Amino acid sequence: MKNIILLLIAVTGLIFQGCSSANEEAKKVKIGICSDVHLPTMHDSEKRITAFIDSMKIAKPDFIIELGDFGIPKKEYLKYFDIWNSFPAPKYHVIGNHEMDGGTSMEKALTFREMKKSYYSFEMKGFRFIVLDGNDKQNSDEKGYRSYMGKKQLTWLRNELNSTNNPVVVFSHQGIGHDPGIPGERYSIANSKEVRKIFEEHNRKNKKARIICCFNGHTHHDYAEDINGIWYVTINSMSYYWLGEEYEHIRYSADVDKEFKWIKYTAPYRDPLFAVVEISTDGVIKIIGKSSEYVGPSPWELGYPEQLKKYVAPRISSRLLEFNKININ
């Protein structure tokens, strides 16, 4: 695997060297990204996180980020956070809906990650990165998992966008794009149209500080779509695709199945999935993904609805996405 990673790094370098020849002043940033590790679900989470961190130490991104549903704050998971924190460069978390499982409060989830707020921003390599939280309450009596960005957060978002002269990249757990689902289900946040309108209005008024792309997890899909000049990219889970109890299938030993009771309702990926993303203001988003295979039968062999077959797969696709070049001079 190490040789494959080194080859991909070399190829990426050649691509971006070609891009920069047209504009030596182009801004570039390199990101290591993963999503939906789901520590409580998988029996081999330590191996998966270690593989990601080891790969990132070779790839040397400017920072790493996980897009939520990492794990709840329990002592038995501290060792996984220690592995994450062993990466010798900046590292960031996004709060997913499962971070509050088991009655965990948002405050406790944040404290466990040494985070001050569930939404925040940072600057790196001439870009502004905005991390959003899709777990706001849509109404005061709302129960269960949430998928909404409230008024206070969106006011903060507008202020963040108005305060920068740098191109913008957005991260969230729940999606802001269309992210297709089974008919009757909605996978993006409830007010995704409202948030996209904020993005698009900002881009109409700003040429240098345009929003380039938004990355999310949550659905365990492999998906990318350009909506009105902004790329919305769903990063697949590091670990599995969730099927549900009606597709129960025991894929590991009896001991594993007994201790990790949710695995039988998933289609696990044999290898951990993650990606390296490189963004250049020359107008290129380069995603170097990974492919694996299912442990046991695929969702389709178990009768899972086939309308999602295009997006449900044991992979994060490698992609070359283009956007209008940003003139930073």
What are these model-derived regions, one by one?
Residues I31, I64, F129, V168-V169:
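Hydrophobic beta-strand anchors of alpha/beta hydrolase catalytic cores
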Residues K258-N329:
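A short C-terminal boundary segment appended to hydrolase-like catalytic domains
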Residues M1-A26, N203:
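Bacterial Sec-dependent N-terminal signal peptides
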Residues C19-K79:
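N-terminal active-site segment of His-dependent metallophosphoesterases
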Residues N159-G181:
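Short acidic, glycine-rich surface-loop motifs adjacent to enzyme active sites
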